[in-house]
């Protein structure tokens, strides 16, 4: 069997901004492998990297998500949206799989703004966007919140989290006596953006060799180096099983308790949740696309055929969908 060439993996220091935004180079690769590896790693980065996210909220005096709170400027839906955006640094030694953790807040200070930094956290936990505004109060002691978080992967909508809350409600502890547990969407993906490029190396070899460069931007909850390492381990775990021709058995790659269902949970997600530009949103709306599930059924060519969608809008929609673990069929890579 022909030996493979020695591959080098390095960080591109010239493009490094910090631990959470940097670029990596893999070279030399045989012709075609740069795109093959880049596509696989990119998709795993966007869909399967572990992180921590809220899944349930309890607010003092709030029985459902459509209420208003006395002496609080924001209504409950606005507060829930902001709580969902709390970003917590992921450390598997602190946030164990299958366990539930609580963030608590009590506005015992005078009237004013309340931020993510005002939450009491589990020991060792850190909020990476402490300046996130949660609410503005007109008096002291009017807002008390418990936010329940867990480790996971991908995207879980509030309907699935409702079912999960019903299953584990007896394990949720809260000092808030009057109020209901409210489910929120969980976006576990710690990746903000990932892209790759492939190019031929200028060598004297008669064999064409390629360079793969991957640019990764995370949300600050995990550093880029650990993210790409985790993606590679996931791919290797799958490929090792496929390569074991003597044991053609079905095996679970991910440990029990950290596994989210692979099928997409997009039936209840409206396109408003994609946070698209007005031009892209209106084009989809005029074409009668209202949910992410409808877009999931499209190919990239179908998307290109929608009236008033230019290349920039198409790229925006594709990028937003991938954050929900939805990948449009692009044909042959």
From Swiss-Prot:
Looking up SMART domains in the UniProt record yields: RPOLD
Q: Which cysteines are joined by disulfide bonds?
A: none
Instruction: Give any GO molecular function from the UniProt entry.
Output: DNA binding
Q: Name one GO cellular component term.
A: DNA-directed RNA polymerase complex
- Which residue ranges are recorded for the region named Alpha N-terminal domain (alpha-NTD)? 1-246
Q: Keywords, A to Z?
A: DNA-directed RNA polymerase, Nucleotidyltransferase, Transcription, Transferase
Q: What class of enzyme is it?
A: transferase
**SUPFAM superfamilies linked:** C-terminal domain of RNA polymerase alpha subunit (SSF47789), Insert subdomain of RNA polymerase alpha subunit (SSF56553), RBP11-like subunits of RNA polymerase (SSF55257)
Cite the EC number: 2.7.7.6
Membrane-crossing segments per the record = none
GO BP terms: namely: DNA-templated transcription
What superkingdom heads the lineage? Bacteria
Assembly notes: Homodimer. The RNAP catalytic core consists of 2 alpha, 1 beta, 1 beta' and 1 omega subunit. When a sigma factor is associated with the core the holoenzyme is formed, which can initiate transcription.
As for family, the record states:
Belongs to the RNA polymerase alpha chain family.
Q: What does this protein do?
A: DNA-dependent RNA polymerase catalyzes the transcription of DNA into RNA using the four ribonucleoside triphosphates as substrates.
Q: Which NCBIfam families match?
A: PRK05182.2-5, rpoA
**This protein is called what?**
DNA-directed RNA polymerase subunit alpha
User: What species does this protein belong to?
Assistant: Mycoplasma mobile (strain ATCC 43663 / 163K / NCTC 11711)
Q: Which lineage is the organism of this entry classified under, starting from the top rank?
A: Bacteria, Bacillati, Mycoplasmatota, Mycoplasmoidales, Metamycoplasmataceae
């Amino acid at each position: 069997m022909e030996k493979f060439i020695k591959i080098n993996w390095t960080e591109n220091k010239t493009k490094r901004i910090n631990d959470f935004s940097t670029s990596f180079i893999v070279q030399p690769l045989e012709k075609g492998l740069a795109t093959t590896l880049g596509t696989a790693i990119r998709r795993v980065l966007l869909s399967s990297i572990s992180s921590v996210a809220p899944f349930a909220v309890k607010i003092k005096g709030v029985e459902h998500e459509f209420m208003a709170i006395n002496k609080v400027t924001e209504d409950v839906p606005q507060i829930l949206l902001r709580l969902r955006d709390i970003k917590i640094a992921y450390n598997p030694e602190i946030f164990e799989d299958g366990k539930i953790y609580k963030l608590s807040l009590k506005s015992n200070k005078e009237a004013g703004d309340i931020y993510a930094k005002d939450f009491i956290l589990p020991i060792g936990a850190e909020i990476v966007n402490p300046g996130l505004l949660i609410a503005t109060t007109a008096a002291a002691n009017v807002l008390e919140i418990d936010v329940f978080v867990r480790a996971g992967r991908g995207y879980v909508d509030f309907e699935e989290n409702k079912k999960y809350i019903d299953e584990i409600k007896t394990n949720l502890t809260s000092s808030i006596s009057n109020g209901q547990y409210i489910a929120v969407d969980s976006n576990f993906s710690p990746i903000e953006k990932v892209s790759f490029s492939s190019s031929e190396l200028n060598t004297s070899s008669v064999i064409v060799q390629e360079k793969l460069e991957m640019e990764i931007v995370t949300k600050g909850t995990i550093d880029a180096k650990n993210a790409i390492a985790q993606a590679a381990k996931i791919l290797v775990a799958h490929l090792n099983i496929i390569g074991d021709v003597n044991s053609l058995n079905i095996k679970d790659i991910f440990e029990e308790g950290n596994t989210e269902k692979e099928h997409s949970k997009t039936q209840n997600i409206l396109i408003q949740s994609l946070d698209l530009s007005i031009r892209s949103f209106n084009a989809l709306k005029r074409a009668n696309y209202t949910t992410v599930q409808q877009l999931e059924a499209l190919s990239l060519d179908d998307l290109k055929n929608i009236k008033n969608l230019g290349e920039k809008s198409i790229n925006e929609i594709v990028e937003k969908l991938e954050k929900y673990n939805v990948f449009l069929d692009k044909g042959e890579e």
